[in-house]
């Protein structure tokens, strides 16, 4: 829950001086990105802006305290202030901030600005006491805020110090309105008005001006003069003499003499006890003082001018002026040191009763009351955990003695889950083992349910570490003993069980487990696990060959992300990536590329290494289009990320796929052979991850002419794929088997493998997997179509594949580009005619298109030149090749390709 007083604009106090000269300056606030009120304590910063804000409608106010240095807390309150200002216009940003579902503060602000782009009219956000922020992450985010905020949004910042936000840059660009100490200091007229409102005996104008000059217009000093002059044997002049030359750091003695010592003992005790609260209401005052009339006492202090003011329109919440609050806390520590822990204990109880556990924790920590801290955690820790209050929980667990932690095993479990959630995976088992050992030493019983909770977490750690056998045993044991009430651990154990089946290739068992995980996670609002379960379901369906069902499952995942505002989580990139994979398989290349690019956008706030698989997808899109240069650029980026980084084998496999295809297309056997020597060769191929790695190996073996080795690999892959019903892998494997048989002159077996692959594609929808095989595939498909050897569906798919090969590849890309031509002209067997009369680059392109079966008009359209120009090119290249007819040119091109090892 958010404390209302932190989001309420201060009520305009009675008897305050209206600062007309400053309000005139503030009338132009909307013309600036930032209005900065920067001066020491006690000059009326908050009062001035409260006066100005009284006439503003669309304004949010955020009053900071020391606890706001936590980025998550800062973000939640800032967005809440905007929500109050806009009447709930930014609901998505609010949900994201409350659930901490954002990659960084800057990413959250970017989402906020998207929603505010649809807001019409001026909008204002006041952040009071920004000097309390010392967290660099917040400063960096606010620099982003100032650079990108909408034109109609003005930030008003109140601070005792100059905030490190690039203020100079705003000043140069005339985007800063700045008011400092000189402007806020009271002038003679304002000082006269001030004393007229507060003194029973008016001061002469000359006396008032003199007092103002002696304290240099410092509003707090003027207030203290007025307060002191009410005391017997005191005068405004005597107070001014004492205050002259003082500043906020030297006020303690004066405040003791002129304020605390002048009130009765009950009022003094009341003030000191209340000082432990950062904000207060009647219920909290009753807890701390035992007085039933807390609200009346606060109102009476306000009337006396004792530096207390209302924080909201309802008058329920009060706070002390920051200067006075600091002074009172110091005096409380001095005068009530023995009572202070008891006061914080009472404050914690008060906040707990109001439903604010985070504030209660602040006081429990201040009291050093580990027993109370433990009780708060036992009651609220998992709620805080599920709201991602990880930093606060860590602070609490550090404060608890370890003996107290192990006496409450659920807190030891929480400590381990905290490490898991903060990606400190290596610490989780160590923490659990230490806790179990300590409990055994102290003879603290570990019942079956607690053991099952530990096992569920250990199972998650094991599957993350690539230990499926260990994970399966732990998850199975956990599910035996976990009651339905322990839903979170049951969700974890069920998810791990499904993932283990997935890794073992037991897809028919994995899918229902992941569907069950999704249902439980949705029921208990564990939406991260619901999304993970949908992603796993999609991957399982892809492996089974049901790509359309996978696509529809992905739609459900996109809906969940939208409904629960999960757009900034890395799992969103995972979803976009597997969507890209499906679209690529179907040769919807533009959409596949768009999905991969969106995935990279999601990861902009994370480590660049996480972009590896999306970059690999972009490389595959370029390869399917026949754009080798672009593909190579993405491949180089992938290689740069892989250099010096540690990746899971699945990631390496996916990154290597475009590399091996690129080497095949360009004939780079040296790079291929070097890769093969270093490539990891898994012991099994029982799932689609491992099948993919062995397929990469087999492709390189075929390219290097190591046909026997490749055949052994492919036979085992196909056997496993059939046994485990890995339909998509079987579809891909058969295409490689086809290439192997074709290159070893086993045309009948090649045809059989191709026909089965086309048949499987009726289920998978594969197109691009055929297209990337290029001319070898095109030749075979032409033959099958001419022989009319295919059923209707397969015939239609073959024609579509052939069309894509002709459209995207054009066979200039691998065979007739500049690299190929350079290699050809230096080949010892190149025909002398070509060596002495080489074709131009354009003529090589035309030859490639002729070889691909393009007509003259199609070639003209492809190269965007006139048909007569194409005829000239054809005539020239016929002459240079020594041929007279198109078929002769095709045969000559075929011989050149064979000579270079491409066909």
From Swiss-Prot:
Binding-site positions, ATP: 39-46
DNA-binding region, residue intervals: 856-875
One Gene Ontology biological process: positive regulation of carbohydrate metabolic process
Gene3D superfamilies: Tetratricopeptide repeat domain, Winged helix-like DNA-binding domain superfamily/Winged helix DNA-binding domain
Activity regulation comment: Activated by ATP and maltotriose, which are both required for DNA binding.
PROSITE patterns for the chain: HTH_LUXR_1, HTH_LUXR_2
Sorted UniProt keywords: Activator, ATP-binding, Carbohydrate metabolism, DNA-binding, Nucleotide-binding, Transcription, Transcription regulation
One GO MF term: DNA-binding transcription factor activity
Chloroplast in keyword set: no
SMART domains named in the record: HTH_LUXR
NCBIfam families: PRK04841.1
Family the entry assigns: Belongs to the MalT family.
Function: Positively regulates the transcription of the maltose regulon whose gene products are responsible for uptake and catabolism of malto-oligosaccharides. Specifically binds to the promoter region of its target genes, recognizing a short DNA motif called the MalT box.
The protein's name in its UniProt record: HTH-type transcriptional regulator MalT
Protein encoded by which gene: malT
């Amino acid at each position: 829950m958010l404390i209302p007083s932190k989001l309420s604009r201060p009520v305009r106090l009675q008897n305050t001086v209206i600062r007309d000269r400053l309000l005139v300056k503030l009338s132009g606030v909307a013309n600036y990105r930032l209005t900065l009120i920067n001066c020491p304590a006690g000059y009326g910063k908050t009062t001035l802006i409260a006066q100005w804000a009284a006439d503003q409608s669309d304004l949010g106010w955020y009053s900071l305290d020391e606890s706001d240095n936590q980025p998550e807390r800062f973000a939640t309150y800032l967005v809440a202030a905007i929500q109050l200002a806009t009447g709930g216009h930014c609901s998505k940003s609010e949900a994201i901030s409350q659930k901490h579902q954002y990659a960084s503060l800057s990413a959250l602000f970017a989402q906020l600005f998207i929603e505010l782009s649809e807001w019409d009219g001026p909008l204002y956000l006041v952040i009071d006491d920004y000097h309390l922020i010392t967290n660099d992450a917040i400063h960096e985010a606010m620099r982003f805020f100032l650079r990108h905020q909408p034109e109609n949004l003005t930030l008003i910042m109140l601070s005792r110090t100059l905030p490190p936000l690039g203020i100079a840059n705003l000043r140069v660009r005339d985007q800063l309105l700045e008011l400092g100490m000189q402007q806020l200091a009271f002038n003679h007229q304002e000082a006269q008005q001030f004393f007229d409102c507060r003194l029973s005996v008016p001061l002469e104008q000359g006396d008032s001006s003199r007092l103002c000059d002696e304290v240099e217009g410092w509003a707090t000093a003027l207030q203290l003069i007025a307060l002191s002059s009410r005391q017997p044997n005191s005068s405004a002049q005597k107070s001014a003499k004492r205050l002259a030359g003082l500043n906020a750091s030297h006020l303690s003695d004066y405040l003791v003499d002129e304020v605390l010592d002048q009130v009765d003992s009950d009022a003094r005790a009341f003030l000191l006890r209340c000082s432990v609260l950062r904000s207060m209401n009647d219920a909290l005052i009753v807890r701390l003082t035992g007085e039933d009339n807390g609200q009346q006492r606060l109102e009476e202090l306000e009337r006396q001018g004792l530096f207390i003011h209302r924080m909201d329109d309802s008058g329920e919440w009060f706070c002390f002026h920051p200067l006075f609050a600091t002074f009172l806390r110091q005096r409380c520590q001095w005068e009530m040191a023995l009572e202070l822990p008891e006061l914080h204990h009472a404050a914690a109880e008060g906040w707990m009763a109001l439903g604010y556990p985070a504030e209660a924790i602040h006081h429990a920590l201040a009291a050093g009351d580990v027993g109370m801290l433990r009780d708060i955690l036992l009651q609220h820790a998992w709620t805080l955990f599920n709201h991602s209050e990880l930093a606060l929980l860590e602070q609490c667990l550090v404060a608890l003695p370890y003996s107290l932690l192990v006496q409450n095993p659920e807190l030891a479990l929480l400590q381990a889950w905290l490490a898991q959630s903060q990606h400190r995976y290596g610490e989780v088992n160590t923490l659990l083992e230490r806790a179990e050992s300590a409990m055994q030493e102290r003879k603290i019983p570990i019942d079956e349910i607690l053991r099952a909770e530990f096992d569920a977490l250990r199972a998650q750690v094991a599957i993350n570490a690539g230990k499926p056998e260990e994970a399966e045993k732990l998850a199975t044991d956990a599910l035996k003993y976990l009651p339905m009430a322990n839903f979170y651990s049951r969700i974890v154990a069920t998810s791990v069980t499904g993932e283990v089946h997935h890794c073992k290739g037991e897809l028919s068992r994995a899918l229902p487990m992941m569907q069950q995980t999704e249902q439980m996670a949705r029921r208990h609002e564990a939406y991260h696990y619901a999304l993970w379960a949908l992603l796993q379901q999609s991957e399982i369906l892809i492996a089974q060959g049901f790509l359309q069902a996978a696509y529809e499952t992905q739609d459900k995942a996109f809906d969940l992300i939208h409904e629960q505002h999960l757009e900034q989580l890395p799992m969103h990139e995972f979803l976009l990536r597997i969507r890209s994979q499906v679209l690529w398989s179907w040769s919807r290349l533009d959409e596949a590329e768009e999905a991969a690019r969106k995935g990279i956008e999601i990861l902009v706030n994370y480590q660049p290494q996480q972009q590896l698989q999306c970059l690999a997808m972009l490389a595959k899109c370029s390869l399917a289009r026949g754009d080798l240069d672009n593909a190579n650029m993405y491949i180089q980026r992938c290689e740069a990320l892989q250099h010096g980084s540690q990746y899971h084998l699945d990631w390496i496999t996916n990154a290597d796929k475009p590399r091996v295809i690129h080497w095949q297309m360009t004939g780079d056997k040296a790079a291929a052979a070097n890769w093969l020597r270093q490539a990891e060769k898994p012991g099994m191929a029982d799932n689609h991850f491992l099948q993919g790695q062995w397929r990469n190996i087999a492709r390189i073996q075929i390219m290097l002419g190591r046909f026997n080795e490749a055949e052994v690999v492919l036979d085992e892959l196909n056997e496993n794929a059939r046994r485990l019903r890995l339909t998509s892998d079987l579809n891909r494997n058969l295409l490689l088997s086809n290439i192997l048989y074709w290159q070893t002159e086993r045309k009948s077996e090649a045809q059989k493998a191709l026909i089965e692959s086309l048949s499987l594609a009726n289920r998978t929808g594969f197109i691009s997997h055929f297209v990337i095989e290029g001319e070898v595939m095109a030749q075979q498909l032409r033959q099958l179509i001419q022989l009319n050897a295919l059923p209707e569906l397969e015939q239609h798919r073959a024609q579509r594949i052939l069309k894509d090969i002709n459209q995207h590849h054009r066979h200039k890309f691998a065979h007739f580009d500049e690299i190929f031509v350079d290699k050809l002209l230096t080949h010892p067997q190149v025909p002398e005619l070509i060596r002495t009369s080489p074709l131009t680059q354009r003529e090589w392109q035309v030859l490639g298109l002729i070889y691909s079966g393009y007509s003259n008009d199609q070639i003209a359209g492809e190269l965007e030149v006139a048909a007569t120009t194409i005829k000239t090119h054809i005539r020239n290249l016929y002459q240079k090749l020594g041929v007279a007819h198109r078929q002769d040119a095709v045969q000559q091109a075929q011989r050149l390709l064979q000579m270079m090892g491409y066909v």
